[in-house]
């Protein structure tokens, strides 16, 4: 990032050992860390809903009153590989990120706080819209938006080899110089050891 920023990890882990490992890494590198409350009311297998509820909580509890000019949400397996200045986009338009049909996916999501504060943000998925995490923002933040009029991220999906799919052998390259490695939590139940060796080597280049 070339624009001044504050990076905080909002940890939605259910495993205490993993959460402590994440916290230790954050403390080592001076990154903010907040452990989110457990979501005992959400059934196993509802990962998108859990993600949306977590985003709603952290926005209303921390970001809404945080004093920032902008805020952004990043998935846990997305990394910048080029210099990035979000203000280039947010000075021209009130949001930027990766479009999923009628909304911006909250794994790569940036918005001006001024406009966000005027809307009822809701990052939950929508069964009615058949949308993933963040789809409910189509009813508020992005209602009536003609996305073709905005500059947004384009995504190119790539595989390390011709074997497998993006979940066990691939990643996405974003036009703004970011990489989404996919399936870091292995919610798809794949053998991802080789993939993560490839990803680590790729990111270190």
Language-model-derived ranges and their functions:
Residues 36-46, 102-103, 155-163:
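A short acidic, often aromatic-flanked loop/helix-cap motif at beta-alpha or helix-coil junctions
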Residues 11-13:
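Acidic ATP/Mg2+-coordinating residue in the GHKL
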Residues 132-205:
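C-terminal catalytic/acceptor-binding lobe
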Residues 48, 78-143:
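Conserved catalytic core of nucleotide-sugar-dependent glycosyltransferases
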Residues 1-5:
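Short, acidic, metal-binding catalytic loop of nucleotide-sugar glycosyltransferases
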Residues 6-8, 148:
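A structural signal for isolated positions on well-ordered beta-strands in alpha/beta enzyme cores
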Residues 71:
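Short aromatic/hydrophobic "clamp" motif used to bind/position activated sugar donors
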Residues 15-68:
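Active-site-proximal specificity loops/subdomain of glycosyltransferases
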